[in-house]
């Protein structure tokens, strides 16, 4: 049994064509156990309207985005394995996959890996942080059997 608990919420109008829950679990299992022995993550799949609202409210950006990460910070006296929530916008992920000439599955996997690293405290604001995070993403994606998600940018 996995040491990562997944709470998958499908909050988009059309759910056909989305990755199966087992794939989301596989992606979480590919990234989190190397950092934490136990984790619980909520992944909420949303449409552009909800992504736009959340991105505006929490990041001040007036557009939908691919993935938002909301780390859970419990008070010190509470010991919970809850890592946080990932909000992933279906339409943005599908559009980006096409633009970046990636398979949809590959880009979904990348968004889960990318979001989990944010939940773990990684960031890409500064160049050195971005380099470290992208390197980890590439390593994890390749371990999961996918290509380097930043390959096109490196060519």
UniProtKB/Swiss-Prot annotation:
Sites where the protein binds Zn(2+): 114, 118, 124
Enzyme class: hydrolase
Key words, A-Z: Cytoplasm, Endonuclease, Hydrolase, Metal-binding, Nuclease, Ribosome biogenesis, rRNA processing, Zinc
One GO BP: rRNA processing
Major place of residence: cytoplasm
Record-linked SUPFAM superfamilies: Metalloproteases ('zincins'), catalytic domain
CC cofactor note: Binds 1 zinc ion.
Enzyme Commission code: 3.1.-.-
Pfam families per UniProt: YbeY (PF02130)
GO function terms (MF aspect): metalloendopeptidase activity; RNA endonuclease activity; zinc ion binding
Function in brief: Single strand-specific metallo-endoribonuclease involved in late-stage 70S ribosome quality control and in maturation of the 3' terminus of the 16S rRNA.
Protein name: Endoribonuclease YbeY
Gene name as annotated: ybeY
């Amino acid at each position: 049994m996995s040491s990562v608990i997944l709470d998958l919420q499908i909050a988009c109008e059309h759910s056909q064509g989305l990755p199966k829950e087992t794939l989301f679990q596989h992606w979480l299992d590919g990234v989190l156990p190397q950092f934490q022995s136990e984790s619980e993550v909520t992944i909420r799949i949303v449409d552009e309207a909800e992504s736009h609202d959340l991105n505006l409210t929490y990041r001040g950006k007036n557009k939908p985005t691919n993935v938002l990460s909301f780390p859970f910070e419990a008070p010190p006296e509470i010991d919970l394995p809850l890592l946080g929530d990932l909000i992933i916008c279906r339409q943005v992920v599908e559009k980006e996959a096409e633009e970046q000439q990636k398979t949809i599955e590959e880009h979904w996997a990348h968004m889960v890996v990318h979001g989990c690293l944010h939940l773990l405290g990684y960031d890409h604001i500064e160049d050195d942080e971005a380099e470290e995070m992208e390197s980890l993403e590439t390593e994890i994606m390749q371990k999961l059997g996918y290509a380097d998600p930043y390959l096109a940018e490196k060519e």
